Amino acid sequence: MQHDDTIAAIATPLGQGGIGIIRISGPASLEVLRALFRPSSSRFGGFRPWTLHHGTITDGCDPLDDVLAVHMPGPRTFTGEDVSEIHCHGGSGVLAAVLEACVRHGARYAERGEFTRRAFLNGRMDLTQAEAVAEMIAAPSREGMRLAQAKLDGLLGQRVGALRARLDALRMQLCVAVDFPEEEVECLAPEAFLAEIEAVRQGVVELSAGYARTRCWQDGALVVLAGQVNAGKSSLMNALLGRRRAIVTDLPGTTRDFIEEPLNLSGLAIRLADTAGLRETGDIVEQEGVRMSRDLVAQADLVLLVTDATQGLQGPELELLRHAGPERVLVVFNKTDLLEGRILPSAPEGCRSVHVAAASGDGVESLVTAIRAAVLAATGAGEPEAGELAPNMRQAAALDKAATILDELAGDIRAHVPYDLCGVRLDGACAALMDVTGQSTPEAILDAIFASFCIGK
């Protein structure tokens, strides 16, 4: 991919809207804008930097739209390059026509994430900040936004950089000891060297653990409604959503495909999935639905095992509980309004449970509280603390690699392995930390990261 030409893309969501923005970045961004823009004021004397100008975008003799346009010279822009923006009406046809005109006058269509990639390549941000751009856009809750903002502010990159600086100091000590063995140059004593390695390793481990602690706040948790047919899973989904989303009938097997909807539980975003009832069936379509249900149960952060309170837990439900594990299951005894004074059923020892009547709404508020607590317990998450840093999966994997290498290095030091071989280990740990911030990340990895971005960002 070329990174020194001029690119253009629609920077706002597609669809109908009041305003849409075309972003142009690169050395010819001002020339492209000049070729298309016709000012509405006779006093227009050219584009003053960082100033909106009113006019018309024309393609040849054809006026395309009434717009506001701005030019922002680099390097103090998002990409670090010269950037121009055209603010036009937000219809998809208007935006497409203006973008095509930009391409005809010297720009090319931007690839996914190419604006942010250029910001990274031009030193405007490190890789943790670049990834945080996509995380902020996709954040499912206010807490997810706050965690992404901390990375956008560079806090994760700064913490990793501080740890790497401590390793660099150790590398210098080893280099001196290896390069000047005949000189009695003071090197860290093994005990002090080990103590510093362990201190850095502990810092790396603590950072990596932030992924597990915050994953459900960053990405949202998958909560799956599962159980036998006619247990009331779809009624429960509708009750939780506060609207009719799933079809509810008295016929067994009404739900054949899974339905997934987002739900915010006091700041904790979840993806709530209603699945086909678990039973043996000769219907091919329903069989596929049951197979998908089992797959979703295997992937779920939390399984809501919905059972008919008048029947109690049956064999298939107990098997699902055993298979999923009690730590990932919240047993929901539904239809308690039909018990008619009978004793409320209970779950096996060690299992969380709650009683509801989805049809009337009784107990749904308690269920919401129970789901939130169960998700946090099942994922090992907690309420995010002030200053919490939240690495993503890729960053956590690189941190884990660094911690493993440092552990091996400590073993080498204890075994009196020669300093030059210890230096190789130390180089590997530094490289793993550099992967976190993108200082040594292979091009193929960068391609994969930025391919997940939207076009225009």
Swiss-Prot record:
- Annotated GTP binding sites: 230-235, 249-255, 274-277
- Catalytic activity, EC: 3.6.-.-
What Gene3D superfamilies does the database record attribute to this sequence?
P-loop containing nucleotide triphosphate hydrolases, Probable tRNA modification gtpase trme, domain 1, tRNA modification GTPase MnmE domain 2
Q: Which domain of life is it from?
A: Bacteria
Single biological process term from Gene Ontology:
tRNA wobble uridine modification
Q: Give every TrmE-type G domain span.
A: 220-376
Pfam families xref list: MMR_HSR1, MnmE_helical, TrmE_N
Residues that hold K(+) according to the record: 230, 249, 251, 254
Listed A to Z, the keywords are:
Cytoplasm, GTP-binding, Hydrolase, Magnesium, Metal-binding, Nucleotide-binding, Potassium, tRNA processing
- What PROSITE patterns does the entry give? G_TRME
Give the main location.
cytoplasm
Binding locations of (6S)-5-formyl-5,6,7,8-tetrahydrofolate? 23, 85, 124, 457
InterPro entries, from UniProt? G_TrmE (IPR031168), GTP-bd (IPR006073), GTP-bd_TrmE_N (IPR018948), GTPase_MnmE (IPR004520), MnmE_dom2 (IPR027368), MnmE_helical (IPR025867), P-loop_NTPase (IPR027417), Small_GTP-bd (IPR005225)
Tell me the function of this protein: Exhibits a very high intrinsic GTPase hydrolysis rate. Involved in the addition of a carboxymethylaminomethyl (cmnm) group at the wobble position (U34) of certain tRNAs, forming tRNA-cmnm(5)s(2)U34.
Q: Which HAMAP family match?
A: GTPase_MnmE
Q: What is this protein called?
A: tRNA modification GTPase MnmE
The organism encoding this protein is Nitratidesulfovibrio vulgaris (strain DP4) (Desulfovibrio vulgaris)
